[in-house]
Amino acid sequence: MALNIEEIIASVKEATVLELNDLVKAIEEEFGVTAAAPVAVAAAGGAAAEEKTDFDLVLAGAGDQKIKVIKVVREITGLGLKEAKELVDNTPKPLKEGIAKEEAEELKAKLEEVGASVEVK
């Protein structure tokens, strides 16, 4: 049974960040492509490096207060209890990708407040 475009878009809208990440990986493997954007070669003189604007929030460890960390992870990602627990149990894992620096720092502080170790990349 074939899905129409609207059904596919609706499914993508309802998916979590982790589910979308898995989808991208599956598409890359199935079709032998990569989701990475092509990189432009810099001129010999070299332009000034652009300041990074998109950051990834990575949960490196849960610490001693795992239940509190799971609650904050659920709040940040919108995941269900089971998915959030699996994410916390299998660190390091990305929580949010391509977010602004301010949001990344705010979420990092919130997670560190409950004892998690977090990296902003």
Curated annotation (Swiss-Prot):
One of its GO terms (biological process) is translation. GO terms for molecular function: mRNA binding; structural constituent of ribosome. It holds the Pfam family Ribosomal_L12. GO terms for cellular component: cytosolic large ribosomal subunit. Gene3D superfamilies: 3.30.1390.10, Single helix bin (1.20.5.710). Keywords: Ribonucleoprotein, Ribosomal protein. InterPro entries: Ribosomal_bL12 (IPR000206), Ribosomal_bL12_C (IPR013823), Ribosomal_bL12_C/ClpS-like (IPR014719), Ribosomal_bL12_oligo (IPR008932), Ribosomal_bL12_oligo_N_sf (IPR036235). Belongs to the bacterial ribosomal protein bL12 family. Forms part of the ribosomal stalk which helps the ribosome interact with GTP-bound translation factors. Is thus essential for accurate translation. Homodimer. Part of the ribosomal stalk of the 50S ribosomal subunit. Forms a multimeric L10(L12)X complex, where L10 forms an elongated spine to which 2 to 4 L12 dimers bind in a sequential fashion. Binds GTP-bound translation factors. NCBIfam families: L12. This is Large ribosomal subunit protein bL12.
